């Protein structure tokens, strides 16, 4: 048997990303790992209900924005509180 484990985003500002995913979606860190040489940090965020995690990769020396190209990608969530989250996201801009 095989199951979906995680999805990854590379981020430039780890704390800003952590704050965003917490406020926007209620995702909290469930595991962290830092490279022995300090070159990168991984933070795995979970929803507290499923085993799926979002992995944020922070390359400590990276300063320029990532070129996301023209490929489409997305991360999907389900909720029975659509209006609540929609309002929160509108307020966040």
Locations of the language-model features?
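Core segments of cupin and vicinal oxygen chelate
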Residues: 2, 8-51, 91
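Short, solvent-exposed coil/turn elements at secondary-structure transition points
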Residues: 33-35, 59-62
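Vicinal oxygen chelate
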Residues: 12-15, 64-93
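Short, charged/polar surface micro-motifs in flexible loops or helix N-caps
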Residues: 48-52, 61-63, 82-83
